[in-house]
Amino acid sequence: MFELSISRLTFHIFKRNMIKKLFTLFICLLSLAMTFTSCSDEAVDVENVNKQTILVFFPWTGGTSSTGLKDYLESNVDSMCAGIVDKKGLTNARVLVFFTEKYNESTLYDLQYDAASKTVNRVPIKKYEGNSHCTAEGFAALLNDVRQNAEALNYSLIIGVHGCGWTYASDWVNYPYMARPKTGSTEKGNDRNTIVSTTTSDHFSGIQFGNDPNRPVTRFFGSVSLSDNAIDISTLAEGIKLSGLKMQYILFDACYMGNVETAYELKDVTNFLISSSSEVMGEGIPYKTIWSYLCSSAPNYSSAVSGIVNFYKNSDIPYCNMAAIDCRQIDKLASIMKEINSKYTLASTVPLDSIQPLDGFSPNLFYDLSVYVDSLYPSGYLKDQFTSQLKLTIKAAEHTDEAYTALTYPYGSFKVKNYCGLSISDPSQHSVAIKGREKTGWWKATH
């Protein structure tokens, strides 16, 4: 009996102590959990988090002794800064500018608004040598530098360069000089001091520099003088993939980037594509005018497109077309196009000049996508499917009555009666189209 009583007492004491210890442990764990929860809440404070980082990518567009579009690109940065000032700063946003000062020297800048002086400071972050940014691995490294210095919920990319659409630099003869040689005299390459006859020449660059009002400058991606500084769209897409990022939008301030082949190539690395299907004038995008539409956690694509085209409509160089493409819809468009291509081909009786051209090449490289599909005369069912999907794909598209080209001699404009927002090179007889289009993802998905 006595022995049993002692055992029970010991048990009750042990039980009471265990309850105390367990209760103490519970309180400690609860406090620890509350501490971590508190820290986590601070880390995801949606009011203070950086919602958008825009990378402005302005690489080299000239040669070893010519500066290309450098002066225009510097003006574009000034225009962005003016837009930031008008908006009274950057609210939950960052803007980093990659600017190439010389063909082999570049700097990554942080645009920082000074509220006291109402100015924008360009704070250097990192210097780069060479042109590794023109490779997929190099561009991915640049994007990683951007993320490390300005991490955000969303990333966007503005590219200001010369451009030649989906085409591959390696498919050009003297890229992209073999444009439209005609009788007369033109500049050789980008050197205005070297004049050559184009009676039999295949070396007309079509890229004009200078302040002659009768010969406006256009932004004919990368450099057209240095092949090592040219970037294929597939390289750009691969670089973005390697970085692990996906862009909210990519804006091409460059010629001829608004084609369905380019949109298809970029569909997995961006939600939207803002681009022109024709040549973009040297002044480029009026960033100050449309900055509030671009620098936003929810960009206003329709207003951005309208702002760009209206700027040129009211200028003394009224030549512009621009569109905002929802790249998330491109796969569905390709699926319908594949069915159309399986049943219809362009009849030999359809003259190519009856399909709206959007370029100055000879033969033409880029044709309006909608007019091309109309020219295939698909059945009502397929045509309706295509039209409905095209409306979902092209969020906004506007154009002036004419487009300008520096690829003809003499230089001039041509009528644009139809512009859906995307071009296509399927019907082109240009040698570069014949060489390259079957290599594109779009062709493989639709044929």
Which residues does each predicted region cover?
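Surface-exposed loop and adjacent secondary-structure segments within mature catalytic domains
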Residues: 100-124, 154, 158-223
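Terminal, contiguous helix-loop blocks that mediate binding/assembly
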Residues: 47, 186-447
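Solvent-exposed loop/turn segments at secondary-structure junctions
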Residues: 60-64, 101-105, 131, 161-167, ...
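Structural recognition of the beta-strand scaffold that forms the well-ordered cores
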Residues: 53-58, 94-99, 156-159, 248-252, ...
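Bacterial Sec-dependent N-terminal signal peptides
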Residues: 2, 6, 19, 29-56
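Bacterial N-terminal signal peptides that target proteins for export
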Residues: 14-26, 276
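N-terminal extension/subdomain marker
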Residues: 40-153
